[in-house]
């Protein structure tokens, strides 16, 4: 029996593609030197779940690594501020589900996002009361599976399960040696029948 649930964030708890797209395009308007059209929701959807600098390489392939890193850092900083104020679309019934689950399980979030992104989600929607801890790529600079391991060890979890919506989420659970629950309503696909 599980004693805790570790959630992915994007595509599992909320869909933030529209406000992220809005915030990124505000920043990109300040940078005429970046030669690309505005970021689209479809482009952003294809990037969900990737580490931040992999997204930068995908969206800004003509720019140097240094420029990719600098622009992504600026995009993420403004994104955190924007999401903290405006929030995003929570999946139907999320707070009710979290309230029910938190009565039986300890709840956590592990995401490939920048530092401050999970906090923006929690602040905008007043959901911090349901989660014991969080971890992200922005703090660990490691793969999601390793971030899962760090959170599991730090919280002395014995039987956690990871819930996510992409094959990368499934792989991160496998890497951490924990079961995976597939959130089929999310952004991605998981090809294995074992979920």
Annotate the PLM regions.
Residues 2-92:
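N-terminal helical cap/lid subdomain that shapes the substrate entry/recognition surface
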Residues 4, 144-170:
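Conserved Lys-Pro-Asp/Glu-containing loop-to-beta segment of HAD-superfamily phosphomonoesterases
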Residues 44, 127-142:
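A short, structured active-site edge motif that brings together acidic residues
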Residues 162-195:
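Acidic, Mg2+-coordinating phosphoryl-transfer loop and its flanking beta/alpha structural elements
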């Amino acid at each position: 029996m599980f004693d805790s649930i570790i959630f992915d964030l994007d595509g599992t708890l909320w869909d933030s593609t529209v406000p992220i797209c809005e915030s990124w395009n505000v920043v990109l308007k300040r940078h005429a030197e970046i030669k690309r059209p505005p970021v689209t929701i479809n482009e952003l959807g294809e990037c969900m779940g990737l580490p931040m600098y992999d997204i930068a390489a995908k969206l800004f392939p003509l720019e140097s690594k240094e420029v990719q890193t600098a622009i992504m850092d600026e995009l993420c900083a403004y994104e955190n501020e924007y999401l903290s104020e405006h929030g995003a679309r929570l999946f139907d019934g999320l707070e009710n589900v979290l309230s029910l689950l938190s009565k039986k399980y300890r709840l956590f979030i592990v995401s490939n996002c920048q530092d401050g992104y999970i906090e923006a989600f929690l602040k905008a929607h007043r959901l911090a009361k349901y989660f014991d801890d969080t971890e992200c790529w922005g703090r660990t600079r490691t793969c999601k599976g390793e971030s899962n391991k760090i959170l599991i060890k730090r919280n002395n979890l014995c039987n956690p399960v990871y819930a996510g919506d992409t094959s990368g989420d499934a792989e991160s659970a496998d890497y951490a040696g924990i079961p995976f629950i597939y959130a089929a309503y999310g952004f991605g696909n998981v090809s294995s029948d074992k979920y």
